[in-house]
Amino acid sequence: MARQYPLEKFRNFGIMAHIDAGKTTTTERILFYTGRNHKIGETHDGASTMDWMAQEQERGITITSAATTCFWKGYELNIIDTPGHVDFTVEVERSLRVLDGAVTVLDAKSGVEPQTETVWRQADKYGVPRMIYVNKMDATGADYYNCINTVRERLQANAVAIQIPIGQEDQFQGMVDLLTNQAIIFKDDLGKDIEVGEVPADLADKAEEYRAAMIEAIAETDEELMMKYLEGEELTLEELKVALRKATINNEIIPVICGSSYKNKGVQQMIDGVVDYLPSPLDIPAVKGTNLDGEEEVREASDDAPMSALAFKIATDPFVGRLAFTRVYSGVLESGSYVLNSTKGKKERIGRLVKMHANSREEVESLEAAELGAVIGLKNTTTGDTLCTEAAPIILEKMEFPEPVISIAIEPKTKAGQEKMGIALSKLAEEDPTFKTWTDQETGQTIIAGMGELHLDIIVDRLQREFKVECNVGAPQVAYKETIKKAVEAEAKFARQSGGRGQYGHCKIEMIPTEGEYEFENAIVGGAIPREYIPAVDNGIREAAESGIIAGYPVINFKIRLFDGSYHDVDSSEMAFKIAGSMAFKNAMAKADAVLLEPIMKVEITVPEEYMGDVIGDVNSRRGRMEGMDSRNGAQIIRAFIPLSEMFGYATALRSRTQGRGTYAMEFDHYDDVPKSIQEEVAGKKNK
């Protein structure tokens, strides 16, 4: 089938924002204006098309990123909706991996918020070109210019206004387009009746000032334009737009525009901005991967290249079962064909291919290079896996996901629910790589772990709603870790003689504290331990490290150097060396000044001035470490690092301290040593 839209007419982009900045409403409006939605869905009523899981509709937040295709002025737009709540940053990370550009939505009265920073850092990591849309210009306290300043200060980004608002708060009527130097005024509620005219007289000076700053910023990114600009020549609209597009794609400029999605003002201009300034698949570097020989290989975005695609999300649909959201990077993915899942080394049959529109589906015969869609019928594919042709295997860059920081015990209310719960949990773990589930060896309880309390609340909610499993839930537990403070040497000998063949393994190790992942170095010389037994020592140590000596938590940040040992011709075996390895590890840890580590959260608390002292006192009582304070719109913002164990139930405490006016956001930051007194308390509880 011939391609309907050439590659340069594609825009794969995401919409990212802090919770409540109006991201879902903005996406809704894009779907409305691009003709895919006849009635606008409102998030307040729980009727929005992008938020299609029942929990999202109740809570009014977006949890699952859905990829939606729509069309605008001869362009195909694929919108990847990303959640703005910090517990779901993995979804954001995952969407950023497959999109080419992004629109960051800011709330006009709050500017840059904590989650905006998190998402911005993730977008920096993947080098995603972006533009900023300052939403809610009609809200009380809206301040466009303050927003631009917060972007420059807190995100260290070169934000350049290409529009300025005409009126704000309830007087917001439209905007001045600084490129064309014209006013755009909205005359009706649906944003269909637009009047373009002269810049209002009272705004002329401000428009002139911001237009001059914009032209200078654009000229600075292009030598030819800079020369013309310095010689005092007028730069044409076309020259400015071409240079601005290039500068945005190169991450040199972040264009800033404004609007009110809820009031239908400025959304069409934002879609025009996506087309004008965000990259097509041809504007970004070709995707890299490794072939089976471990050599780097590049795949160009072209239908003629060998097929390669990345499954970036697995979801369970009540009607068709398992959907694998996929982006095709090169070649053509055809329904009914066989492909190789190169990450797992398994063949897969492509059942049906569908393009998603929020919650409805359109079946297609094929997905071409740069297209996004969902594959039905894949058995072994999970998030982050590569699909490719067998003739030209490639593994695209693997996605990395953070480890969970909080866990709870969960049990079904009825015996019959046990098996149902097991199946449901494994399905949910397949969809979400930051959600883990296992059985506690000591208590036999089922444990679920995730990125925060809301994350686990939603998992329990889905168990009840989608899988009809009623559960009892235990109190949240912190994912402590253990580590060592000094390098030590230790040895262990495992020798057993009980009639017939004995067991013999003996090893000497050095255990060294590090900052990174576990490392095992084989420093045996002269065959003190035969080569075939070395992996057994490593495995013994890995297993022993799952349960440290303080309170049985996993041990991290250490390196093992195996430097000596001995063996017996007859009695030595892999099992004996595995046991010797785990004994040596325990002996080493006992001498190495072991400490308990706890997850420390980066917390940002927003409170009215009068509650400041009270809230800071409370932060200190929670072992918090103050990082700084700002004021924004008459509210104080307190930034601190607080141990996760002290944050349970904080929402309620903050509400009662501030009469419901305080809010907070937190995200995992790092692990740190637990004070001695608390270490003893944790160990005492665990070892009871």
Swiss-Prot record:
One cellular component term from this protein's GO annotations in UniProt: cytoplasm
Alphabetical list of InterPro entries matching this protein: EF-G-like_DII, EFG_II, EFG_III, EFG_III/V, EFG_IV, EFG_V, EFG_V-like, G_TR_CS
One record GO biological process: ribosome disassembly
Say which domain of life the source belongs to.
Bacteria
The record ties this protein, via Pfam families, to: EF-G_D2, EFG_C, EFG_III, EFG_IV, GTP_EFTU
Its subcellular locations are: Cytoplasm
Q: Where is the tr-type G domain?
A: 8-282
Coarse class of the primary localization is: cytoplasm
Gene Ontology molecular function, alphabetical: GTP binding; GTPase activity; translation elongation factor activity
List ligand-binding residues for GTP: 17-24, 81-85, 135-138
SMART domains, per database record = EFG_C (SM00838), EFG_IV (SM00889)
Q: Which UniProt keywords apply?
A: Cytoplasm, Elongation factor, GTP-binding, Nucleotide-binding, Protein biosynthesis
Gene3D superfamilies recorded = 3.30.230.10, 3.30.70.240, Elongation Factor G (Translational Gtpase), domain 3, P-loop containing nucleotide triphosphate hydrolases, Translation factors
Cited CDD domains? EF-G (cd01886), EFG_III (cd16262), EFG_mtEFG1_IV (cd01434), EFG_mtEFG_C (cd03713), EFG_mtEFG_II (cd04088)
PROSITE patterns from the xrefs?
G_TR_1, G_TR_2
Record-linked SUPFAM superfamilies: EF-G C-terminal domain-like, P-loop containing nucleoside triphosphate hydrolases, Ribosomal protein S5 domain 2-like, Translation proteins
For this chain, the family text in UniProt reads: Belongs to the TRAFAC class translation factor GTPase superfamily. Classic translation factor GTPase family. EF-G/EF-2 subfamily.
Q: Which NCBIfam families match?
A: EF-G, PRK12740.1-3, PRK12740.1-5, small_GTP
Physiological role:
Catalyzes the GTP-dependent ribosomal translocation step during translation elongation. During this step, the ribosome changes from the pre-translocational (PRE) to the post-translocational (POST) state as the newly formed A-site-bound peptidyl-tRNA and P-site-bound deacylated tRNA move to the P and E sites, respectively. Catalyzes the coordinated movement of the two tRNA molecules, the mRNA and conformational changes in the ribosome.
Name of this chain's protein: Elongation factor G
Source taxonomy: Bacteria, Bacillati, Bacillota, Clostridia, Eubacteriales
